[in-house]
Design a protein with these regions (language model features):
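N-terminal Lys/Arg-rich, disordered targeting/topogenic segments
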Residues: 1-9
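Residue-identity detector for glutamine
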Residues: 4, 38, 64, 83, ...
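FNR/FR-type flavoprotein reductase catalytic core
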Residues: 9-18, 25, 29-35, 124-273
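Ferredoxin-reductase
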Residues: 27-137, 190
């Protein structure tokens, strides 16, 4: 009996060790997959209103991501870019901006099927943003760690969306992907960011399942979403993206209206500079 117990205990220990090793291998595999970087070419950079830029990057054929995803964008090394890059923009062709920051997490404003990667961002003065938004066409950047905090498994429940400022970059791909599939409500507190406004207005006209407004104040957006709250309640998923203060205020508004916090998914844009 004693030998049987020892044998059983040894077998159990081996099983536990095998499970631990297997899980470790899987975990490292996931980390390696998410963290692997790809070098992308800058196609063009549109200078929009104010300090806003829309960056167009070449998309590798095999690259896929979830709508609303963000990624780590690293500045190029000097060996990967023409010498003229440093002549055009101080620090643009170096691996680090003047403050030592060489990468930031930025949201992808396009879907995998659009043929290019769009990055919508402010240039509010940081060395990193100055370098990024002034890279000449043909420059290289590295993209890695694709992830999303707005993904959901709900197959057909309504999406009620709020975007503040450049937070529209996270919501636009979700709207494009879900058109015709579920009820969609979107209020964009634009703060002058109107780059996708015409596109969204046309989509709302052509798709009865999309209700869209461009808002001029947080209270206006809250009033717009309140109608959706009264209509859908906790049967909808609430997707909020943009400046942290606005997202926090909208989250509190929804919770005060009785929306379960599990139904609210957020993406806070903390690094607008």
């Amino acid at each position: 009996m004693k030998k049987q117990n020892m044998k059983r205990g040894k077998t159990m220990l081996i099983t536990i060790l095998v499970v631990i090793v297997s899980l470790s291998i899987i975990a490292w595999g996931i980390i390696a997959y998410l963290g692997r970087g790809q070098t992308l070419s800058v196609l063009s950079i549109e200078k929009l209103e104010g300090d806003l830029s829309l960056i167009h990057l070449a998309k590798p054929d095999n690259m896929q991501w979830k709508a609303g995803a963000h990624a780590k964008i690293s500045l190029p090394n000097s060996i990967d870019n023409p010498q003229t890059a440093s002549e055009l923009v101080t620090g643009a062709s170096k691996s680090k901006a003047k403050d030592g920051e060489s990468s930031r997490w930025l949201t992808i404003a396009s879907n995998s099927n659009e043929g290019e990667i769009l990055i919508l961002t402010h240039n509010s003065g940081s060395p990193y943003k100055k370098s990024l938004t002034n890279l000449p066409a043909g420059s290289k950047v590295e993209l890695s760690w694709l992830d999303s905090s707005l993904s959901t498994t709900d197959s057909n429940k309504p999406f009620v969306c709020f975007a503040s400022d450049v937070g529209i970059a996270a919501i636009r791909p979700i709207i494009k992907e879900e058109l015709g599939k579920r009820e969609l409500v979107l209020s964009h507190l634009s703060k002058g960011v109107m780059v996708f406004n015409n596109e969204l207005e046309v989509s709302a006209k052509n798709h009865a399942n999309l209700s869209y407004e461009s808002s001029s104040s947080l209270s206006q957006s809250q009033a717009y979403l309140n109608e959706a709250v009264e209509r859908y309640g906790n049967d909808a998923t609430y997707l909020l993206a943009g400046q942290a203060d606005d997202v926090n205020a909208m989250t509190k508004f929804l919770e005060d209206k009785g929306i379960d916090k599990k139904k609210i998914k957020t993406s806070r844009f903390r690094g607008l500079k």
